[in-house]
Amino acid sequence: MLSIIRRKTRIVDITKQGNGNVPPACHLCSRRLTKEWSFGEGTICSFHRIRCRVQCGRSFWHQPETPIDGLSWDSTTWELTRISSSKDPDISGQKDKRYGRRKEKNPKTDPPALDSRVREHEPIHEHEPIPGRVGPADTKQRCKANLRGDSGFVSIGRSNHPKLSREDCHNTRVPPGTQGVRGGNVQLDKPRERPVSYQHGSKKRSEHRNPVSRSHRRKKAKTRTKTSKLGKSRDIC
């Protein structure tokens, strides 16, 4: 029991005077924190400092008549002064930084006006031909003229090919009513002769090819070598 009383008295003494090893406690809640802020004659903990900021709505200033945690202020003792700290800049009378940054990033501004150099083009009618361009109607006329064989319309960028100009290889005009002729010498009535699979190779190879298989040749070569060796051995004996 005595030890508890002594310990409490020691805590009270440390709270009043302070110790070199133990930081002085808050005068409002007796909390000992590693970081405390001096306001006038006493100290205040970080919790009450935050409460002070929240209630008064300002950064580091507090009015003496505003109570904290329901405790009345004594103007002579608890006249809060401005904290002289480089880490905590003075943002008094301002809102939280985060909301200010969001508003700066996404400002509500009117869309920029159109550049004076961008001029509005006059509306062009759909069927009105544009100078310098080939319209769809013009291309259809050219295609029909090419099919008819009219010389009045010449296709752009194409030479007078015999098949395109309905002429044969000898530059003679092919009458349009002839059967089997379409766009020149191409005859569609006669089917094109295709080579059979065994005719793909050259004829010379097939003529001079030896009908004897390779395996048969090897057998013949082996028998020749055996007979020659036997003959030599008989001669020596």
Curated annotation (Swiss-Prot):
It is a single-pass membrane protein. Keywords: Host membrane, Membrane, Transmembrane, Transmembrane helix. Residues 1-148 are cytoplasmic. Residues 85-97, 116-130 have a biased composition (Basic and acidic residues). One of its GO terms (cellular component) is membrane. The lineage of its organism: Viruses, Riboviria, Orthornavirae, Birnaviridae, Entomobirnavirus. This is Protein VP5. Residues 84-237 are annotated as: Disordered. Residues 166-237 are extracellular. The chain crosses the membrane at residues 149-165. It is found in: Host membrane. Its main location: host cell. Residues 214-231 have a biased composition (Basic residues).
